[in-house]
């Protein structure tokens, strides 16, 4: 089962509002520039196409939608600035932020100003555990990813030596700690636990330590730029250990950086829905605009569907809190991801993750 990987090139029309006269404005906050721009571009493409499709059918409750994009560059200060600008423009609905380090501070600003947000990709448990009324997701949580990866390791690789490394950021450390906790509860102890500094180019000190520990696998909590470099430098030092990671590995840029060093690396990711009947309309619409139906794009598309459901159930878009309550009612919501239900803190309550593997430059199921 193949999964399309991230394309950083399909940004068609995503930096422009769609109409000056739309009734409901949906803001998008995510990295259109910067080291993880691939994630933001992909998610934004999904949002744009979903909005196009809703508008072709008359919008939501007869009101047209408009998309306005705010680039956070994956930098917290820029994300906060984007949120304040969005609030100043009176926007009440947001898809995003894309990364967890932005989602946490931005969610506070949006909550204080009665703005409902639905992130297609922020997985930190802290985002929803604080009990803010305005937080929704179309992805799972780090603890769910960590648990899933650890259980997979225990089931298939229990006798292998594994180290755990993270990038000290909200997303990466959250993944690593969740993996470690579940791994240890399952009776497996890592041979080493440590961290690296994101943005650096030389990880020789960490590579030497991992080589010394004779690791068979390394669980890496972090994004693809550091993962790719770590893999490449491990191979250069004669260490054949694949990485295991989270959905930050789901981009062709990982293979571009690491090359064949990425062969066999595993990662948890949202369950591939491209073969499901529920996803076919979205896939057709994405492809019609030359946009690959990739994970973040699918999640972005689904985020608009969830907002549309809530607005329709609430009767209007005038009260974002009423829209949030409608989404969290427990009723199944038909989306591109299939039927999903929400708990009272905005988390999806159904299974959302699977295990995947890099093989010959492509992503295949590892189940």
Where are these regions (language model features)?
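Extracytosolic ligand-binding ectodomains
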Residues: 2-7, 21-367
């Amino acid at each position: 089962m193949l999964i399309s990987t991230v394309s950083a090139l399909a940004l068609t029309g995503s930096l422009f509002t769609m109409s000056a006269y739309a009734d409901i404005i949906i803001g998008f906050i995510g990295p259109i520039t910067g080291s993880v721009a691939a994630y933001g571009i992909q998610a934004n493409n999904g949002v744009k196409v979903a909005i196009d499709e809703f508008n072709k059918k008359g919008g939501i409750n007869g009101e047209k939608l408009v998309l306005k994009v705010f680039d956070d560059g994956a930098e917290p200060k820029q994300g906060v600035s984007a949120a304040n600008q969005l609030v100043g423009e009176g926007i009440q609905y947001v898809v995003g932020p894309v990364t967890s380090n932005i989602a946490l501070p931005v969610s506070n600003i949006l909550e204080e100003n009665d703005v409902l947000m639905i992130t297609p990709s922020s997985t930190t448990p802290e985002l929803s555990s604080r009990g803010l009324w305005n937080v929704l997701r179309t992805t799972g949580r780090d603890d769910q990813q960590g648990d899933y990866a650890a259980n997979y390791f225990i089931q298939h690789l229990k006798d292998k030596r594994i180290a755990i490394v993270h990038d000290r950021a909200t997303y990466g450390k959250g993944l690593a700690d969740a993996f470690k906790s579940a791994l240890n509860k399952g009776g497996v102890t890592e041979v080493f636990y440590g961290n690296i500094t994101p943005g650096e180019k030389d990880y020789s000190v960490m590579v030497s330590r991992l080589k010394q520990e004779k690791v068979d696998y390394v669980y890496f909590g972090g994004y693809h730029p550091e993962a790719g470099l770590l893999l490449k430098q491990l191979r250069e030092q004669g260490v054949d250990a694949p990485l295991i990671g989270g959905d930050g590995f789901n981009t062709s840029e990982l293979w571009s950086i690491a090359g064949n060093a990425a062969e066999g690396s595993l990662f948890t990711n949202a369950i591939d829905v491209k073969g499901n009947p529920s996803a076919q309309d979205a896939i057709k619409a994405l492809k019609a605009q030359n946009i690959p139906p990739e994970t973040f794009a699918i999640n972005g598309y689904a985020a608009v569907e969830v907002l549309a459901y809530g607005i329709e159930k609430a009767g209007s878009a005038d009260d974002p809190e009423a829209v949030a309550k409608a989404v969290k009612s427990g009723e199944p919501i038909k989306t591109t991801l299939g039927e999903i239900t929400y708990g009272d803190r905005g988390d999806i309550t159904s299974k959302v993750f699977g295990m995947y593997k890099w093989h010959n430059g492509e992503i295949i199921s590892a189940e």
